[in-house]
């Protein structure tokens, strides 16, 4: 086995663990110990990172440090299978930064279909300069339901360490997304067990 990308938080531990095992034996062991689990990978999810830097929206434009963070991030280190648009000419034609910010369903859906993604998240980072201090905030939208699924409080940042702060935001969102996937599927399993008991 190997363990990578370990993350420790209050009452939560996550890591990418690669193991060779007999699935049925492991599942039986977890059941015997009363440990809830879900063993499938999450859906392929298109990440569309936009940065609003002092009221200038940047998606495909260069530089987009928020897009660059996701490009450098190991996309396979999470339960959800994150993918990024390549930024080719047809991507630019399909979806502009304004379209993404306005959550234009059909344009987002078309881009997601191109990348064979079953989900699409618009990750908007706002960077504001207020009284010579920079503030950063992330708001994540589900591109299909148009709902806010994740947000952070406005925090002070320093432009010299902006990349570090953006990296933390990416990690926080990825952890949230993984936890949500596990919770939703544990809920489904528990409902199925309840229904079977009722029958």
Give the location of each predicted region.
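Short, solvent-exposed, polar/charged sequence segments at loop or secondary-structure edges
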Residues: 1, 82-124, 132
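Post-signal peptide N-terminal segment of secreted/secretory-pathway proteins
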Residues: 1-28
């Amino acid at each position: 086995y190997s363990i990578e990308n370990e993350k420790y938080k209050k009452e939560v531990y996550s890591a990418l663990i690669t193991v060779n095992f007999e699935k049925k034996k492991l599942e039986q062991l977890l059941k015997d110990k009363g440990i809830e689990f879900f063993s499938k990978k999450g859906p392929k999810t298109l990440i569309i990172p936009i940065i609003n830097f002092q009221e200038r929206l940047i998606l495909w434009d260069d530089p987009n440090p928020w897009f660059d963070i996701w490009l450098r991030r190991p996309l396979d280190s999470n339960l959800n299978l994150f993918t990024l648009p390549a930024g080719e000419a047809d991507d630019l034609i399909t979806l502009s930064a304004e379209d993404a910010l306005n959550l234009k369903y059909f344009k987002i859906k078309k881009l997601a279909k191109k990348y064979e993604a079953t989900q699409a998240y618009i990750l908007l980072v706002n960077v504001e300069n207020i009284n010579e201090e920079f503030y950063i905030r992330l708001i994540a939208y589900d591109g299909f339901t148009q709902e806010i699924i994740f947000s952070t409080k406005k925090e002070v940042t320093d432009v010299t360490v902006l990349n570090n702060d953006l990296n933390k935001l990416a990690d926080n969102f990825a952890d949230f997304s993984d936890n949500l996937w596990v919770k939703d599927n544990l809920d489904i399993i528990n409902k199925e067990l309840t229904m079977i008991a009722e029958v």
